[in-house]
Every structure is written in structure tokens, then in C-alpha cells.
Amino acid sequence: MALPSSHDVALAAERRSAARLLLRHPLVTADGPHADAFPLVRRHADWLAQRFQQVLGYRLLVEATYARLFKAGLGPGSGHRMERSTGTPFTPRTYAYLALALSVLVTAPEQVLLSQLVADVRAAAVDAGLSIEDSGRPVEKRTLAAALRRLVDWGALTETDGSVGSVAAEAGGEALLTVNREIARSIVAGPLTQSTDGADLVLRSADPGFGGPRTYVRRRLVETPVVYLDELTEAERDWLRTRQRREAEAFSELLGLEAEIRAEGVAMIDPDDELTDLRLPGTGTVAQAALLLVDRLVRRLRPDEAGHPAVGGRLTIGVPIPPGLVAELLDELVEEYGRRANWQRGYLDSPALLRADALELLSRMRLVAPAGPLRADGHGVPPWYERAAGDGRAVTDVSAARTAVVGEWVLLAAAARYATTVSLKHADQRAAQPDRQGEPSS
């Protein structure tokens, strides 16, 4: 077999870089933070559009000044939250301001004063039947400013004179803004006109269309840290198990991802660690506490006889975390490490806050999850979507793979990757080194 030429290798590398950029940043502008890579997207626009449509069912729009990849959702409970530059997550009110501002911008003049934009947003809220307080409270102003700042980051607004941040000024500042209506119109990706309310929009946005299980599973593989089998319908599990090796090769070629295939599910690993906005291990109090917490949870709760049913094991995707155990372990960690590691005073004074934020991070990493109905049981599946595998084929039974009472937390299989131990080197006795152990059985 002939080896690929240097031209072919370079071409594949360029296309892979462009595809990875669009997955990480679905809106790329010619003068935005990724302007250097925008010509690369333009150069391979046709190939990228074809591949994204074929593989993930995503539409790619490439114009002279921007490129927009219209990604789909994954259904209830699977969204990626937006955050301010400080890392503070958007509140429902921030999302409401963002949606209202977008509704104004799609028909706004090319230039608008900040005060006029704010007035139009309040008018749009009235039209939508939403209650927007005009109390002048600083927190309300900062919330509005955060939503407008996101529109500036996306390129839908340009600060021609002044800053959108002046809306939060005590005296009420002014600014001249330039509106890019094309970008504003391209931001919303879901089927708004077909949806009856927010919940229906989330459900319809996740519909993979004619691609069915194939498209949904592929989207889940690239958009989430881990795909567990019980988070898939019977038809999706059947498709994944029969195609997982070929899919691993395809994702390696398209995006440079490496597949980790185990009995409990599949994870796509990015060797360059670029395609994720989550880091664990990480810096900061929450990341440190979460890493130590998950290690101790695994040591306490590791199930016996877990493994692959085909070789005599018992498929275990999640085990219940007893009520009170997380608080108990975090109290121990604060006592052992909190002051020595200079954890933030706010977390040391508020165990409940530390518990909530640590669980939130572990949940986003798919290492723990609140107990509740699953997609394998039909939760979040549109009524028109085919759930059963065809031809009566036998599919992995996941009915007892995750047991817990609704309202409790569940420790998930991938958490075992973060259970560390200390081993002593006998050769020179230089130091004790951390090691990984306890991988989920395959």
C-alpha cells in the first residue's frame, strides 16, 4: 500500500485543525479571537460542510466574514452552561436577557445607542410577558451587562464608542454600538418556529433527524466526556456496539481523537486536551477538592465483580452514594488539606457551597450524576423517535447497571480513572509516586 504524500498529510492536518476549531468554537469570525484560523476554515469550507453533515448532522455556514457551525443539543439535562469571564455560570436571568437582546438585534439598525438597546430589550420583555425589574439594582445591571458582553464576544455587537459594561455603571453610562445582524440571526440553532415552549425546544433540538441512532450517538461521543450505555436507547446501544471500532478510526482521522472502549461505554480522548472546557486535575479549591473527593468515593464504593457480562462479570455503570457520605468526606478533606493548601476562605466557611460546587464539577465530568430516569428508559426521547433495535437483535441489558433512589447521587464508572494510590519504589527508594489504578473493567 502506497504511503500518503506529504501534501496529503498536510491537507489532512489542515482540515483536522479547522474541524477541531469549529467544534470548540462554533462561531468563528474574521476579526475575532480566532481570526488567524478563519482563512483555514474558508479554504476547506466545502469539505468541512460535507463531513460535518455526514458525520454529525451539523450544518456549516461559511460567509465572507464569519463561519457558523449549527450544533444540536443532546436532550434534557445535557446542555453546556455559559459562563462569564470570571467563570461564574449564567443564571436563568442572564439567559433571558441574552435571548431578549438577540430578538432585538435581528431587526436593529446598523448602529444603536446602548440606552436605546436597553430600552428595546425591556420592551421586548413586556411583549414576551416577562417581568424585568427596572429597579436599578447593581446585580440587575451586571446581569444585563454580562449578556451584552457575550454578544460582543460573538461579534453580534461591536463597541464603536464606549463599552456595554457602562450599563452597569452607577450613573448609567452610554455607548455607541454597531450591530451585525447576520451574525445575530445565525446564533440561534434550534427549531424555534416549531417549538411550543422551552422544554419542547430542547427536545426538538436533539432530534437527529434521518440519521437516527447513528447521528445521535456520534454527537454524544464528541460532545460529552463519557457515553454510558444506559444513556442510550436500545437502538443506539445496538448501533454503538456494532460500529464502535470503525467509529474510533473515523474520529481519529477527522478530529484526532482516541477512543477508550469499555464495558460501561465509550469515551473519546483528546491527546492534545483542547476540545474540552473542563479540567480535572485542575487548579483552584473546587478542582482540588473534587479530585480528592472522587478518589475517596471510589475507595469506599468500588463494586465487587464488576466487569463485562460476556466474561462472567456484572455490568455496573453506577453505584449509589449513601446520603451524607459526600459531606463526611469533604469535612475530612477540609481538615486535612483545606488550610495547608490555602483553599478559598469562602469554601472553608461554607461546607454546603463546597459540596455543591464539587459535585457540579464531577457531574459535568460525568463522574457522578443525580439519580433519575435515563434515556434507556425513554427519558428525553421524542415520541416519534425509534427506540428499539431492529430485527429483534439482542442488545446489552442495562436495566440493573445503575441502581439508586431518585434524589440521591450516583458514582459513575469513569470515576475509577481518578482513584490514585501511592506505590513505593524499591530500587532507590527516592520517593513515593502517585499511580493510576482501578480502571473500569472492559
What name fits each language-model region?
Residues M1-S85, G162-L177, R181-P281:
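Eukaryotic partner-binding/assembly regions in large regulatory complexes
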Residues A18-P39, E110-E133, V227, H308-P309, ...:
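Short acidic, hydrophobic short linear motifs in intrinsically disordered regions
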Residues L23, P92-L113, A287-P320:
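Positively charged, polyanion-binding regions of nucleic-acid-associated proteins
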Residues H34-F38, G87-P92, S103-Q111, D134-K141, ...:
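Short, charged/polar micro-motifs that form catalytic or ligand-binding hotspots
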Residues L40-R51, S135-D153, Y347-R364:
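Short amphipathic alpha-helical interaction segments
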Residues T65-G73, A145, R149, W154-G209, ...:
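Accessory beta->alpha helical hairpin/"wing" motif in late/C-terminal subdomains of nucleic-acid enzymes
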Residues A101-T178:
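Internal, well-ordered domain-core segments that constitute the primary functional module
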Residues R299-G307, L325-S442:
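C-terminal functional regions that serve as terminal interaction/effector modules
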